[in-house]
Amino acid sequence: MRALLLNSSPHGEASHGYRLAKEMVGTLDMQVVERDLVADPLPPISKSYATAVTSGNHHGGVFDWSERVIREVEDTDLLIIATPMHNFTVPAALKLWIDHVLRINRTFESTSTGKVGLMRDRPTFVLVGSGGFHSGERARQPDFLTPYLRYALESIGIQSISFILMQGLVGGDASVSEALSGARSALSRHVPFNRVAPVTA
C-alpha cells in the first residue's frame, strides 16, 4: 500500500496542513511518497506541450513531467493534498500540478456529455488551511477552492474526496489549536485513519 502526499504550501514542512497530514499518514502501515510542489516546482506548461495536446503529436519527451506526476497518482492507494487557500482558490503551485495531471486521452476523455475520468478512484483527502473563514457561521469570504478542486479530481475519475478545513489560522495559538484539533478529529472518522488509535498530541 502506498500513499502520495502533496504539499503546496509556501511554508513547506512548517505548514500546519502538511504537519497534520504527515502525522496522520504516519499512523498507517503504508509507504509514503511526498512531493513538495513549492520547493520542487513543476515546469510551466509550454507552447510545445500545448501544441502536442491539440495536435496529437507526442514525440520529443514533451509529456515527461506530466507522465511522472500522473504515474505518481496511479501508483498510490491514498492521495493526500495539503494546501492553503490563496485568494479564494488553489495556490499557483497546485494549479500547475492539476494542469500536468489533467490531460485529454490520458487521464480523461471528452464525450458528448462531458469529461469522463480514466483513472482509478482512490480515497483522497484535501487538507485546506486558511487564515480566515470561508465555511460555517463565521465565513466572510467565498470558497472557490473546494468546488474547483473537486470537479478537477472527479473529471479524471477520483470520486472519493474529503475536504478537511483548518480555518482561522492567523487568529493566534488558541485558534490554531482549535483548527488542528477539529481537522484531526474529522480525519480520524474516515477510512483508513479510523482504523488506528487517534493521535491527541
Language-model region placement:
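Short, glycine/serine-rich, charged loops/turns that create anion-binding
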Residues: 10-11, 131-132, 168
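Glycine-rich phosphate/pyrophosphate-binding loop and the adjoining helix
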Residues: 136-201
